């Protein structure tokens, strides 16, 4: 049964010379034109609605190629067909007929005739399967990707048909050429193969082939109303139109071709009926069953393989489409801006569809809001339309239509309820006849509606964007976690092959420095083990710059690292960590601790000098770093750059670091000879570095200076530190003897050279002590209280002074402040800021008001910073006093070497006396060892 698109089909076929396209709007004005021109015009008219001119140009080119191929095939089929019935029938009418045509095959026993017919039947079956696949997927026909899937299915099956035709016609070169020419056009459009098959079958005289034609026509009609489903409007849902335009235009072109093929098939039916009446011989009765079975097996195998691939592609695409629809349903919303006139039109359309079970498709009007505040116009997504064509709906399409009707009814009810909300007085205004007021109220309604729905849409859109961003961030985090886990697994596997080591881990809230003597105080010289727990801020730096000489052990309860530092002859200026007094076990935990000394946030805490100093020293000691860059430390520890520079300036003045310029520094350590030199020289100096007045903290120095004892000791050496930690001097001599004097643990051993003309290996030499103790003035007295020692005129002493100038700091305000504050700390008493204020200003009366004014001066504030740096390094202990002033007390702790007793016992006058005694002993030994002269 044929389901046609045009009523009175037989009258149209017999009487009308022009062929009407199912999408054509032309009637009688096309009578004088040819069929091809009419179809081409109708095809182009269905494309011109598109806003994109690029698409129309593409379609015109495609159309010209199709119809050129169509005309050539139409002519060639009359001359190259294997069935002689067609040639006998069109003998008089066909100008291309030639009895001597090489393509004409008049062999009654030719087996290829049946092969071709069988192939045509198989092609029809394949096309029927394609149409079934197309109909099965019609539920997704409104989606953009389904048309593409169906086109792929048809193209794949058409390619199978091409292969089958080529395999079946290998016996005859002429037939092979004809089949290749006929089937090469199959790839142009999806339904071109139907046309070729129908022409073959129509030229035969068998009833079975006529029935196949009817089946093909039915399938073509099914394709037409399924293609028409693409034009059903989506109730105002805003969508992208580009893909729909392309797919709809392809479907329109297919429908036009199918219509034209249908006309030709109907004409061929009549010709076949005439052939039967004239009793022409039928060559199709000579069947070759062996070839048929072989071809059938080949077709089935190819179809099975291709169908499996096609089904997999369809399933994947359908899953993607479902995901897209699920996301779009959350964002896309039916637009409510429909006027009353448009509502009535939609209601009439729904009633007409319910009564007639036909769907009349019209081009949707461009909906725009009439209010002045509306800034956007809303376009319906359906750019393509049909006019005055009635298409029968399938059951699944009827279900979709009912769902659309329900959505429209809900939309109308929502609009009616929203229009009545808050405007109950509108009827009264209508009764009064105030048209101006009505228009104003309507405008206000529309403005409020637009604002309401725009706000809702924005909320939905923002929420969807947030969800998308959250999903992306979660995916990125998951990927990063997976990568980290993989890296950790690789690292763990590599570590299992080597020694059992573990990286240091510590909570983010603790910044702690633990010195090696807390675990191994018995062996401070040979080796020292340090247990350091790192922080979160320095974990990255410690992992990247961990020393190869450190080995770590892991336990089940806590994870710590024990670093073993061995004193070797190749290392110089190695870190020698201090030995604290029994009452001080230094641990700097200052964040998220109840007893901590900082209660601010971590961000503010990292701007404080004490916190930054603790992080810096911890990083340097735990990672065994000697040379570093300030910018690199800033990025690793995430601290303030300017605070870090202030700390390093104080440490440079204290001889704890050395500046190598360009923000490069060298960490010298707490027991380096430069720091010991600096501490001894400041403690035994006889002046105040701030006021330049006479000031003595060493009793022996004060007594000897008052008695007029001249200090002539040129060289001062320290052997308490391991010799490997000292850099050797340039000059050497074989005439060196040493005498050591061992004291208690708090004191150190000193090595004195036997004469001033000899310098000692592995020692740091100092300038003349008189020069240092005079505050760097180069000798002479400054202020009252004892005469200053003069510089020795010996040349070797002068060379030692020149070599010692590298240890002399440049006198600046900060250096003088650091020197004087350190001198006060080494005086072995609890120092307060009150004492510092009046020590720096001795001429001011010691009152509370003066103390408050002096406390806010720049130098005293710098003393606060110096005290915080020394406290973080564990050189000073800070505590609050109980007095009314509530000032802070500072107690000097020092290092394992530099203590108050060490400073007192290493007075330069005492060293000078020991030096003189040693010289006298050497002279006596030399006199005794000399041989007696002969008499």
Swiss-Prot record:
Coiled coil stretches, renumbered: 262-331
Polar residues bias locations: 367-376
Basic and acidic residues composition bias: residue spans: 265-274
Keyword Isomerase: no
Pfam families: E2F_TDP (PF02319)
Record InterPro entries: E2F_WHTH_DNA-bd_dom, Mucin_signaling_protection, WH-like_DNA-bd_sf, WH_DNA-bd_sf
Coiled coil found in the keyword field: yes
Biased composition (Gly residues): 778-791
Designated name of the protein: Putative uncharacterized protein DDB_G0282499
Source species: Dictyostelium discoideum
């Amino acid at each position: 049964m044929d389901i046609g698109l045009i009523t009175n089909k037989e009258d149209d076929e017999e009487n009308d010379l022009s062929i009407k396209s199912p999408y054509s709007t032309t009637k009688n004005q096309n009578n004088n034109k040819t069929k091809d021109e009419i179809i081409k015009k109708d095809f182009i008219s269905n494309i011109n609605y598109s806003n994109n001119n690029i698409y129309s140009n593409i379609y015109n080119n495609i159309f010209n190629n199709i119809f050129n191929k169509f005309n050539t095939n139409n002519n060639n089929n009359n001359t190259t067909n294997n069935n002689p019935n067609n040639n006998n029938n069109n003998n008089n009418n066909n100008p291309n007929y030639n009895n001597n045509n090489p393509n004409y095959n008049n062999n009654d026993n030719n087996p290829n005739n049946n092969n071709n017919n069988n192939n045509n039947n198989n092609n029809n079956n394949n096309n029927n399967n394609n149409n079934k696949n197309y109909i099965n997927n019609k539920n997704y026909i409104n989606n953009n990707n389904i048309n593409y899937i169906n086109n792929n299915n048809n193209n794949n099956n058409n390619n199978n048909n091409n292969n089958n035709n080529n395999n079946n016609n290998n016996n005859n070169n002429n037939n092979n050429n004809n089949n290749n020419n006929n089937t090469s056009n199959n790839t142009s459009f999806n339904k071109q193969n139907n046309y070729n098959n129908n022409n073959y079958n129509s030229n035969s005289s068998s009833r079975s082939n006529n029935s196949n034609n009817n089946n093909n026509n039915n399938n073509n009609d099914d394709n037409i109303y399924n293609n028409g489903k693409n034009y059903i409007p989506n109730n105002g849902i805003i969508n992208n139109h580009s893909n729909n335009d392309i797919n709809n235009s392809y479907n329109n072109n297919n429908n036009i071709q199918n219509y034209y093929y249908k006309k030709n098939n109907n004409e061929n039916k009549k010709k076949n009926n005439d052939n039967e009446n004239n009793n022409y011989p039928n060559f199709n009765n000579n069947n070759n069953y062996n070839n048929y079975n072989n071809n059938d097996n080949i077709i089935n195998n190819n179809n099975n393989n291709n169908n499996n691939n096609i089904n997999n592609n369809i399933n994947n695409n359908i899953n993607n489409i479902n995901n897209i629809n699920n996301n779009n349903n959350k964002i896309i919303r039916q637009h409510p801006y429909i006027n009353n006139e448009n509502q009535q039109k939609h209601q009439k359309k729904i009633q007409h569809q319910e009564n007639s079970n036909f769907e009349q498709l019209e081009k949707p009007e461009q909906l725009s809001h009439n209010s002045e505040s509306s800034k956007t116009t809303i376009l319906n997504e359906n750019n393509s339309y049909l006019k005055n064509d009635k298409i029968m709906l399938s059951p699944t399409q009827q279900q979709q239509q009912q769902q659309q009707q329900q959505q429209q009814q809900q939309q109308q009810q929502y609009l009616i309820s929203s229009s009545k909300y808050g405007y109950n007085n509108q009827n009264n205004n209508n009764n009064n006849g105030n048209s101006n007021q009505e228009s104003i109220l309507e405008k206000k309604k529309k403005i409020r509606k637009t604002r309401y729905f725009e706000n809702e849409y924005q909320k939905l859109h923002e929420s969807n964007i947030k969800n998308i961003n959250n999903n992306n961030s979660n995916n990125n985090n998951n990927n990063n976690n997976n990568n980290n886990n993989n890296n950790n697994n690789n690292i763990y596997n590599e570590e299992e092959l080597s020694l059992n080591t573990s990286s240091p881990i510590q909570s983010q809230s603790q910044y702690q420095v633990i010195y090696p003597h807390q675990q191994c105080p018995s062996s401070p010289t040979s080796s020292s083990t340090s247990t350091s727990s790192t922080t979160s801020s320095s974990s990255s730096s410690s992992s990247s710059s961990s020393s190869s000489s450190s080995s770590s052990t892991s336990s089940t309860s806590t994870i710590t690292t024990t670093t073993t530092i061995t004193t070797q002859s190749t290392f110089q200026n190695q870190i020698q960590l201090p030995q604290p007094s029994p009452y001080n076990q230094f641990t700097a935990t200052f964040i998220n601790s109840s007893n901590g000394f900082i209660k601010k946030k971590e961000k503010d805490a990292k701007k404080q000098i004490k916190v930054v100093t603790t992080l810096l020293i911890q990083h340097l000691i735990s990672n065994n770093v000697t040379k570093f860059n300030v910018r690199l430390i800033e990025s690793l520890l995430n601290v303030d750059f300017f605070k870090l520079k202030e700390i390093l300036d104080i440490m440079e003045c204290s001889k704890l670091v050395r500046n190598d310029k360009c923000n490069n520094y060298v960490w010298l350590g707490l027991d380096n000879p430069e720091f010991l030199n600096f501490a001894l020289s400041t403690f035994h100096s006889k002046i105040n570095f701030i006021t330049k007045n006479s000031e003595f903290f060493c009793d022996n120095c004060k007594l000897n200076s008052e008695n007029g004892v001249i200090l002539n000791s040129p060289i001062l050496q320290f052997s308490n530190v391991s010799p490997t930690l000292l850099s050797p001097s340039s000059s050497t001599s074989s005439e060196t003897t040493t005498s050591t004097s061992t004291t208690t643990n708090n004191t150190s051993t000193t090595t004195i050279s036997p004469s001033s003309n000899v310098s000692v290996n592995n020692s740091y030499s100092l300038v003349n002590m008189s020069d240092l103790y005079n505050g760097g003035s180069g000798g002479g007295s400054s202020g009252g209280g004892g005469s200053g020692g003069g510089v020795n005129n010996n040349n070797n002493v002068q060379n030692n002074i020149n070599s010692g100038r590298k240890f002399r700091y440049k006198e600046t305000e900060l250096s003088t402040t650091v020197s004087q504050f350190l001198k006060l700390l080494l005086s072995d008493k609890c120092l307060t800021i009150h004492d510092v204020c009046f020590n720096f200003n001795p001429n001011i009366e010691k009152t509370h008001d003066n103390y408050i004014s002096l406390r806010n001066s720049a130098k005293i504030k710098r003393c606060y910073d110096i005290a915080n740096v020394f406290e973080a390094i564990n050189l000073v202990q800070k505590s609050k006093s109980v007095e009314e002033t509530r000032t802070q007390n500072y107690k000097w702790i020092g290092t394992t070497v530099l203590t108050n007793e060490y400073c007192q016992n290493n007075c330069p006058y005492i060293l000078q006396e020991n030096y003189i005694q040693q010289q006298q002993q050497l002279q006596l030994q030399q006199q005794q060892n000399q041989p007696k002269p002969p008499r």
